[in-house]
């Protein structure tokens, strides 16, 4: 067999399941975290991906622990009336979307409940008012950034294996290579994507053009072999804005000027609307480009997003919320919770490229923004400059090292603190400094309700602050991810 790696994986999976039962006629009763559904069997919780409440299924158990089990649908006996038809042919394989089979109203209901469970059960937080969850107007084609991986070894479907293995000659490299998303749990394989309904249609067009161009010239453009660390084509990043601008970043493993120039020239000619055509030579073991030099082949080194008359520059390394339209709704909630009157000194923690800082700057006296990434702070300063905003100051460094009592003494005590930390939440030292600063209001924006609940415990432990409002904002339809904004007021 030419493609033994796939059969090895199948045999390994079969061995793992050998002693685990197949449960028949199981009714799914609800939804759980991380995009899974659940039911209860003999006092244990059973988690099942891609199931819907009301489904009656035969379920193959894949993991069995003392308090819970995990399984996969072997057969849907009776589909739930809640089930909808997924829009994507890659659904259940790709791993990017977990809930395309559920109506959006049910997705929102589940996400809202996840937030409430986190605050009430994990944090034991008393919330004055839960405002209705803000759903996304766009549930398809809403992402402004997508990243794809070139791999010499793509995921092959059983029918593809049958065809290739029936041949007397080994498959050509282009028949095994792919450009798409990493499969969950399989670091060296990608799913060759035809259409991704998360990004703009032009993203599909550009990705398919690059894939077809390189696949037609396998000797010149070998796809990357992650295990052997060899090949040329590594990753492709695409970004778009609501203003119609497009950024393309092609990452090569090594320099090959002739091949690189030919590909980028072909891209430029086929898509003259590209605003920023960039490339990177990344010879490291991993795919991250944060520490790599960015080269501009054509156009600008950035694209611009617009929000409420403000323009924000976005570079290849910049963080910007991946749902532009819904980011505006998120920031409006944060600004509303800040209750600015024009006289306040605001601290914007984890400011990124200064989007929130600049968004609220015209409604307050001054803003101090702090962010770990120096390049992001440079973008934040530029964003203030291009928008004629002169009441912002930005500082780069580790939050717990920058935000100190001395820093606050130098820059003035904040009336309002807006904090939007990464998924890990805030360091305990940062929480302690916020409490010492004693702002009148704290607005906590979070992409992880569990760590937000943990931090809210610390912020409310002394009794100085109460949580007055909470509002979930859905930035990522068809996924389990959710943003939540909380207002704390000093008693």
Question: Language-model features: where?
Answer:
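Terminal RNA-binding accessory module
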Residues: 1-86, 90, 393-394
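Rossmann-like S-adenosyl-L-methionine
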Residues: 2-25, 33, 255-491
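Short, acidic/hydrophobic/Gly-rich beta-strand patch recurrent on exposed beta strands
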Residues: 37-42, 179-183, 251, 380
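Extended interfacial segments that mediate partner engagement and assembly in macromolecular machines
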Residues: 75-86, 95-222
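Short, solvent-exposed loop/turn elements at beta->coil junctions and helix N-caps
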Residues: 131-138, 224-227, 234-235, 471-475
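Short edge beta-strands and adjacent turn/loop segments
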Residues: 229-243
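Short, aliphatic-rich beta-strand segments
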Residues: 238, 244-253, 311-315
